Amino acid sequence: MSLFSSLVHNVRGQLIARIISFAINMYLLRRINNDVLGLVNVRLTLLYSSILFLTREPLRKAEIIRGSLPKFINLLWLSPIISTVISVVCVYLWYAFSSTSDEVSWSVLLSFPISAIIESIAEPFSVISLRLESKCGSLAQHFAIGQGMLICVKRIFVLAGLFMFPGMYHLELFAYAQYIGAIAYLLFNFVAFYIYIRNKSIPELEQFSTFSDLFPKFSEGIDRDSIHAVFTMFSHSILKQLLTDGSAYVMTFTELLSLKDQAVYDAVERVGSIIVRTILSPIDENCNAYFSNTIRKESSVFNKNTDNHDDLVDTLSKVLHVVGVIGFVACTFGIPYSPVVISLYGGKLLSENGGALLLSLYSGYILVTAINGITEGFAMASMDNRQIFTHGKFLFVTSIIHLIINYVLCVYMNSAGFIVANIINMSVRIIYNWRTIREYLGDKCPSFTEVLPTGQTSIFLGVSLLATSFTYLLFATTPGLSYTLAHIAIGAVCLILTAQDTAQHDSVFTVIVDSLAKKHRD
């Protein structure tokens, strides 16, 4: 199965879930106390996401495919142990050094790390889904459905709980949602893979004769080089997490922002990251697996063609162009439509607390994070041990600088400083990653200008920015639904015309559109 087909399944699977979650969040912002949202969406969610990221990242990206399938499976089942150890450390840090423990009960606080541990039990199935490409696309669909279900179940439970248990404390409702979502996700993975193995419906899973082959066999042991690779990647993951969520750590362990301001920042970030989570994250996940599997020539567990570097370079070039165009489109339409989106999504809470400015800045962040996701995935897959060690030192230095910049800019710019700090951080990482890619590919390295839209698309984007900025000043600043709808309608026309021109005249997108059309006909 091609990388493009995997991406289609992943994006399509998560798109519906993100739309449902987005709609429910619109309601929750108007129904739940701002301080509760600040606690849950920033401090407690950071605890949960830190545990999951540090558990998942090493296993999904490290070079752990080394010839022995049982040893590979044994290594994957270290994920619950790793998650438990990380949870103990993180809970201590949150309890001792943040103010979260003063505002939530132990039962609520522990629900987030415990749910992360439950989800980590299903991590072996997720890694297998990412590492094995199925010709029929079932594994790509499985991963996308699982991630989408995890998102939806939690939000739907909270929404239903508000009506079914109106007297329940909202923090407890979020805690129960964590458990329900994690258990549903775990059961989905177990049941689905049991059916896959029993029915032998997926060719890549035929090497597992029984369902028990997916579980550890202690007599086989674990490959030492793979363990070393995981722990090396783990150290990188700690630094990457600090770089990725530096603003959330500053908010959690300092008192620079009130819980209300934290809720506003998180809500804006959720709106701004809808493109990141729905489109760019699935692209990153599939491309990271593709680059890792293709570049690692010594892998013999999976039957991969790892010799065709021309295809590798071509794929890198095309993916960079796709995410670059997506980022520029987000910038173009994000700036003039930020006030409208903020008003519709969060009402007065966001509109009256600088939400429009934050979302406009976030539009620029989307562009740099889109490029960084691809360049970093390729760079990490191509690094040898010496380069990985050097990269670790780079991340260590930049993570410290990033936290300092976050703190300083927050003092002077409030929450807007976090987004500016993230843009600076991502830009520096892109420069470092591109240098690594150039060293690996040499003369075959594509030009970095591949991220830019074509000249014709750039003209359409420029005209769209001017037109929508004018209509914002003309219509959106005037109270009244009809004026707002006029502003939205003109933007929709500009977006459709830009998309149509890009699909017809941009060679990369022309191939994508033709592939989608052919797949639909088949």
Swiss-Prot record:
Keyword Acetylation: no
Statement: the UniProt record of this protein carries the keyword Endoplasmic reticulum: yes
Organism per entry: Caenorhabditis elegans
Protein name per UniProt: Man(5)GlcNAc(2)-PP-dolichol translocation protein RFT1
Lineage: Eukaryota, Metazoa, Ecdysozoa, Nematoda, Chromadorea
Pfam families assigned: Rft-1
Family: Belongs to the RFT1 family.
Keywords: Endoplasmic reticulum, Membrane, Transmembrane, Transmembrane helix
InterPro entries documented for this protein: RFT1
